[in-house]
């Protein structure tokens, strides 16, 4: 039974395609594990929904992954983590559930001076969880919350470097370019897919950080703690599902995760 558990897949869930940026890091750091990814593109973006709606959709997604035999769950969505992680952990006590939050701590530690911009959805920035982070790390440094409604939709449509998304990001970031910005935190798992465009706008001196590595390290720790890590020496399997039953979205998912 324990061997079956070790070989069971790890479930990843996001409001759409964004969580693939976290899954990509997991495939790099733990290639021998099996994975299931569920993207809820039918209901994306979550950032404009109420906390109650986000919780309901998150429970549906977790149920899907558990029915597929997931041994652990990664909520690869900042918005869903903020709104639903606590309730999900209370309900599913027997399964490790790992969330993701804006990587504000490492961003602050990287530099002694300069402001930090946190790009995220409105829902993430409005949640108590983010306000607590602001209270903790924003005491001695300027932290600028930057809601980006509309950016997720570009990425869900596969527009990662077109003129429209470039103009959108310029409009968002240009007002801050006369300040000393040390770091930008990507507080939504969709945003790493446009990291290069953001870097071009802000310049190479600004560090751009996301929470993927920290989340995968925590996943690894929890699996080891529960004796659930795969002992296979082979590369694991990956199955991708999406609530939007559209061939194009699955093709885009594979492209984003660089599956040949």
Curated annotation (Swiss-Prot):
GO annotation, biological process: cell wall organization; peptidoglycan biosynthetic process; regulation of cell shape
Catalytic center residues: 77 (proton donor/acceptor), 188 (proton donor/acceptor)
One Pfam family, short name: Asp_Glu_race
GO molecular function annotations of the record: glutamate racemase activity
EC category: isomerase
Swiss-Prot/TrEMBL keywords: Cell shape, Cell wall biogenesis/degradation, Isomerase, Peptidoglycan synthesis
InterPro entries: Asp/Glu/hydantoin_racemase (IPR015942), Asp/Glu_race (IPR001920), Asp/Glu_racemase_AS_1 (IPR018187), Asp/Glu_racemase_AS_2 (IPR033134), Glu_race (IPR004391)
Matching SUPFAM superfamilies: Aspartate/glutamate racemase
Enzyme Commission number(s): 5.1.1.3
Disulphide-bridged cysteine pairs: none
Record's catalysed reaction(s): L-glutamate = D-glutamate
Function as written in the Swiss-Prot or TrEMBL entry: Provides the (R)-glutamate required for cell wall biosynthesis.
Family: Belongs to the aspartate/glutamate racemases family.
HAMAP family: Glu_racemase (MF_00258)
Name under which the protein is recorded: Glutamate racemase
């Amino acid at each position: 039974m324990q061997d079956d558990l070790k070989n069971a897949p790890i479930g990843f869930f996001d409001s759409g395609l964004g969580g693939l940026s976290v899954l990509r890091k997991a495939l790099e750091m733990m290639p021998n594990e099996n994975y299931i990814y569920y993207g809820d593109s039918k209901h994306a973006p979550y950032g404009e929904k109420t906390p109650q709606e986000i919780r309901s959709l998150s429970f549906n997604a977790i149920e899907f992954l558990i029915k597929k035999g997931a041994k652990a769950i990664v909520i690869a969505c900042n918005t869903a983590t903020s709104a639903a992680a606590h309730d999900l952990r209370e309900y599913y006590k027997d399964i490790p559930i790992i969330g993701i939050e804006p990587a504000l701590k490492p961003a602050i530690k990287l530099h002694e001076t300069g402001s930090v911009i946190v790009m995220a959805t409105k829902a993430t920035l409005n949640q108590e969880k983010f306000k607590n982070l602001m209270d903790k790390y924003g005491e001695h440094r300027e932290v600028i919350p930057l809601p980006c409604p509309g950016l997720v939709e570009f990425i869900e449509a596969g527009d990662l470097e077109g003129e429209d998304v470039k103009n959108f990001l310029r409009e968002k970031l240009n007002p801050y370019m006369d300040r000393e910005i040390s770091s930008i935190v990507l507080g939504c798992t969709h945003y790493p897919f446009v990291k290069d465009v953001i870097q071009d706008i802000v310049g190479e001196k600004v560090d751009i950080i996301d929470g993927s590595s920290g989340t995968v390290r925590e996943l690894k720790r929890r699996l080891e703690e529960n004796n659930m890590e795969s002992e296979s020496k082979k590369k694991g399997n990956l199955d991708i599902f999406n609530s939007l039953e559209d061939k194009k979205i699955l093709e885009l998912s594979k492209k984003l995760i660089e599956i040949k």
